[in-house]
């Protein structure tokens, strides 16, 4: 499951304390700042490019609240069902700075590796209950990205088209 929230009126309230169990949540911030606090004692501010990996196991209570006064908040949260044998484990919280992510860069693209491996770049978290592959791919114009999804994996692609051009200048 992927949750993406772009509702400007909605994010101001954030997500006050609420429980999870039996899942892993992987939150990747594209823009903005979020404050995380949970029942394991973990607390911190996620900023653009950072990853929060929460393994809820037998249960965790956490909150995610905006840590910014203005601007747009944009991020993705992937929910991964934990195998039955892991659902009684002690919860864990991992905070990964954006500069710790694996990164592949060539003339056509940048691939930030949140989990898994692309070319020689690897995601920083290796202790997985499943074998996730999670990339943020930035393509140059008219370029493409190809990746063979391993047999047995489920997959999805979220595509966001952003075209950046020079601003038009008007003379008055």
Predicted segments with their positions:
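Short beta-strand His + acidic residue motifs that chelate non-heme Fe in jelly-roll/DSBH
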Residues: 35-38, 54, 61-70, 145-148, ...
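Tight coil/turn sites that cap or link beta-strands
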Residues: 49, 57, 140-144, 152
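Ligand-binding loop in jelly-roll beta-barrel domains
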Residues: 57-86, 169
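Long amphipathic alpha-helical segments that form oligomerization/scaffold cores
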Residues: 82-109
């Amino acid at each position: 499951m992927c949750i993406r929230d772009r509702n400007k009126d909605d994010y101001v309230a954030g997500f006050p304390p609420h429980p999870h169990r039996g899942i892993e949540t992987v939150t990747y911030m594209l823009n903005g700042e979020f404050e995380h606090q949970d029942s394991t004692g973990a607390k911190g501010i996620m900023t653009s490019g950072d990853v929060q990996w929460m393994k809820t196991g037998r249960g965790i209570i956490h909150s995610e609240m905006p840590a910014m006064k203005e601007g747009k908040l944009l991020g993705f949260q992937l929910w991964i069902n934990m195998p039955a044998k892991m659902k009684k484990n002690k919860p864990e919280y991992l905070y990964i700075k954006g500069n710790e992510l694996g990164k592949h860069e060539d003339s056509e693209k940048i691939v930030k590796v949140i989990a898994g491996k692309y070319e020689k770049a690897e995601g920083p978290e290796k202790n997985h209950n499943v074998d996730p592959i999670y990339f943020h791919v930035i393509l140059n114009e008219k370029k493409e990205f190809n990746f063979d999804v391993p047999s047995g994996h489920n997959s999805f692609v979220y595509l966001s088209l952003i075209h950046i051009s020079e601003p038009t200048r008007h003379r008055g």
